[in-house]
Amino acid sequence: MKPRKVMIIGAGNVGTAAAHAFVNQKFVEELILVDLNKERVEGNRKDLADAAAFMPGKMDITVRDASDCADVDIAVITVTAGPLKEGQTRLDELRSTSRIVSSIVPEMMKGGFNGIFLIATNPCDIITYQVWKLSGLPRERVLGTGVWLDTTRLRRLLAEKLDIAAQSIDAFILGEHGDSQFPVWSHSSIYGKPVNEYSVEKLGEALDLKQIGETARDTGFEIYHQKGCTEYGIGGTIVEICRHIFSGSQRALTVSCVLDGEYGESGLAIGVPAVLSQNGVKEIISLKLDEKEKEAFANSVAVIKKSIQSI
């Protein structure tokens, strides 16, 4: 079998957390680290190699330039422009990050990259769309982590309220990985029952679904303000998405996909349920949304498109 190779571009908090999660799960044969800070990335390589030695099996952990990528299966982009400086806005951050991505992706394509791009860099949906445009790859081979972490948080919150396993819950968040995301309660269930029908049966009362959705949305911001970054959750998200791609699981995850008519939209990437295969996005699942959800989706589309137009 061909060795599975993942390249992580950006060895900061998110990239390193993802690398450590890959080491712990060890389903790839080579993990490749890329960073402009050569001393830091070499230190991370050695540290991760030590961690990998405790795990069964063999994994090569190497350092390369981003352009040395012709044999890479999945390239994970986690680069950022760094924290905002005083007086800078989110738009300034977007433009700085966009410039970095604009320099990396063309070099990778010149280097013969023919794999799958997975984008974790924020703002995820905008950068995912930009990478797709820069790469010239088919849209199914460029996706972002999107709202899969937000969806997982939503399920965790429900599981904690109901004292059940999160894996028993089918609940989704769609839209932007940001303020305009929204839960799709019309397609959410627990053991085949609507969420609050199950809650009333078990707890004797309905859950405050609005509050739970807001908490799922805001948790990332809370973590950022409490510790200065988010890393472990998004690191785990990256690894899970890669695992489903390599295994060809055919499982639907809410990742950021480039739309071409789905949900009546095009010209952007946005978080929607997508079936993953070894070629990336096999199918985008178009859910029949209720009127309130349609409005929320349209709002999220408008937010993302406005940001795309600004770069």
Curated annotation (Swiss-Prot):
SUPFAM superfamilies the record matches: LDH C-terminal domain-like (SSF56327), NAD(P)-binding Rossmann-fold domains (SSF51735)
Residues noted as binding substrate in the record, renumbered to the chain: 90, 122-125, 150-153, 230
Localisation: Cytoplasm
InterPro entries: L-lactate/malate_DH, L-lactate_DH, L-lactate_DH_AS, Lactate/malate_DH_C, Lactate/malate_DH_N, Lactate_DH/Glyco_Ohase_4_C, NAD(P)-bd_dom_sf
Pathway assigned to this chain's UniProt record: Fermentation; pyruvate fermentation to lactate; (S)-lactate from pyruvate: step 1/1
Domain of life from the UniProt record: Bacteria
Chief localisation class: cytoplasm
Enzyme class, first EC level, given as a word: oxidoreductase
EC numbers, comma separated: 1.1.1.27
One term under GO cellular component: cytoplasm
GO biological process: glycolytic process; lactate metabolic process
Family: Belongs to the LDH/MDH superfamily. LDH family.
Protein name according to UniProt: L-lactate dehydrogenase 2
Gene that encodes the chain: ldh2
